[in-house]
């Protein structure tokens, strides 16, 4: 009898402590889910266009986090559309093939040989890696380029001195509608052809913004290598969490937004001006940045809205 009591005395505290720990963990889970619930309800059935690139594409752990975030978005009824670049991998292949990489005004100078490599890497390699990653997690993905189904019509950028660098002339969403209606995730590389059938390399932010506008998306989200829009580019704590469209324009005019952040902010402004609900610039170096931005009160980056 004594030994039975001793055994019970040893077991009961363990059970009690275990139950207490589980309760704490469960409370945290419930809190997270409760915070996410109104956002899940709001965005279910809505379209979110995500530009995927930068560090989030270059590191395996961040890739996995992005793919899981996208799979979760799909599972709660959100309709994500992914647009991607692939600059680092393009540079690696240019180096292998001994083709010099050239940049001017922040854009890749793209001659015919470089364009062949860009198309091979973006359409044939990077796109399929993303599609495969999503498919493995149960998010049915379909790989496309801007040329497929005339999704994006390109035009030469500027005066043509950058070679086969393009801009978006027109977006035709007819090819996307049946894909989205069937629950698939379109994964789109930023290569598109002109009306003459000549392939051009287009900035992926630009492609994402124009597709978001054409789809009348709820959100445009740009994954970047910065926390978002900073009032002081050397001080991450100066992050601006939310801006109105007019305020974003003013920051560009005042030079607060400068350098590589300028085209990203301009991309957001154009998308909002064409009816996108909100545009976000977030730090893709943070694991699960997508979920933190979409499903939490605080978010993680900068959200630009058309009105208060």
UniProtKB/Swiss-Prot annotation:
According to its record, what are the GO cellular component terms? cytoplasm
Residues given in the record as substrate binding sites: 86-87, 108, 201
Pathway named in the protein's UniProt entry: Amino-acid biosynthesis; L-arginine biosynthesis; N(2)-acetyl-L-ornithine from L-glutamate: step 2/4
Q: Where is this site: Transition state stabilizer?
A: 51, 264
Q: What is this protein called?
A: Acetylglutamate kinase
As its record notes, the protein acts as a catalyst of: N-acetyl-L-glutamate + ATP = N-acetyl-L-glutamyl 5-phosphate + ADP
Keywords of the record: Amino-acid biosynthesis, Arginine biosynthesis, ATP-binding, Cytoplasm, Kinase, Nucleotide-binding, Transferase
Enumerate the subcellular locations listed in this protein's record, separating them with semicolons. Answer: Cytoplasm
Q: Could you tell me the Gene Ontology terms of the biological process aspect for this record?
A: arginine biosynthetic process via ornithine; L-arginine biosynthetic process
Q: What does this gene product do? A: Catalyzes the ATP-dependent phosphorylation of N-acetyl-L-glutamate.
Pfam families per record? AA_kinase
The molecular function terms of the Gene Ontology recorded here are: acetylglutamate kinase activity; ATP binding
**In the UniProt record, does the keyword DNA-binding occur?**
no
**Source species, domain of life:** Bacteria
Which family does this protein fall into?
Belongs to the acetylglutamate kinase family. ArgB subfamily.
Cite the HAMAP family for this sequence. ArgB
Q: Which PANTHER family does the UniProt entry name for this protein?
A: N-ACETYLGLUTAMATE SYNTHASE (PTHR23342), N-ACETYLGLUTAMATE SYNTHASE, MITOCHONDRIAL (PTHR23342:SF0)
EC id: 2.7.2.8
Q: Name the CDD domains on file.
A: AAK_NAGK-C (cd04250)
């Amino acid at each position: 009898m004594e030994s039975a009591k001793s055994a019970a005395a040893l077991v009961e505290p363990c059970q009690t402590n275990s139950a207490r720990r589980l309760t704490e963990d469960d409370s945290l889970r419930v809190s997270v889910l409760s915070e996410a619930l109104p956002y899940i309800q709001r965005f279910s059935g809505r379209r979110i266009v995500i530009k995927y690139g930068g560090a989030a594409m270059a590191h395996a752990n961040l890739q996995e986090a992005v793919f899981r975030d996208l799979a979760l978005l799909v599972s709660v009824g959100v309709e994500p559309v992914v647009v991607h670049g692939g600059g680092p991998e393009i540079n690696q292949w240019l180096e292998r093939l001994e083709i010099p990489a050239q940049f001017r005004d922040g854009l890749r100078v793209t001659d015919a040989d470089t364009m062949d490599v860009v198309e091979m890497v973006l359409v044939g390699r990077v796109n399929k890696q993303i599609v495969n990653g999503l498919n493995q997690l149960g998010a049915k993905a379909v790989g496309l380029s801007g040329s497929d189904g005339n999704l994006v019509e390109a035009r030469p950028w500027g005066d043509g001195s950058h070679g086969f660098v393009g801009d978006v002339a027109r977006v035709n969403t007819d090819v996307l509608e049946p894909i989205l209606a069937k629950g698939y995730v379109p994964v789109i590389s930023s290569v598109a052809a002109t009306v003459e059938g000549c392939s051009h390399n287009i900035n992926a932010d630009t492609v994402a913004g124009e597709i978001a506008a054409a789809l009348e998306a709820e959100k445009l989200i740009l994954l970047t290598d910065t926390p978002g829009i900073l009032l002081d580019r050397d001080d991450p704590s100066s992050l601006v969490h939310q801006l109105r469209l007019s305020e974003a324009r003013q920051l560009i005019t005042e030079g607060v937004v400068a350098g590589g952040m300028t085209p990203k902010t301009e991309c957001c402004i154009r998308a909002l001006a064409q009816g996108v609900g909100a545009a976000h610039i977030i730090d893709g170096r943070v694991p699960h940045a997508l979920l933190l931005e979409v499903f939490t009160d605080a978010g993680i980056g900068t959200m630009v809205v058309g009105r208060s």
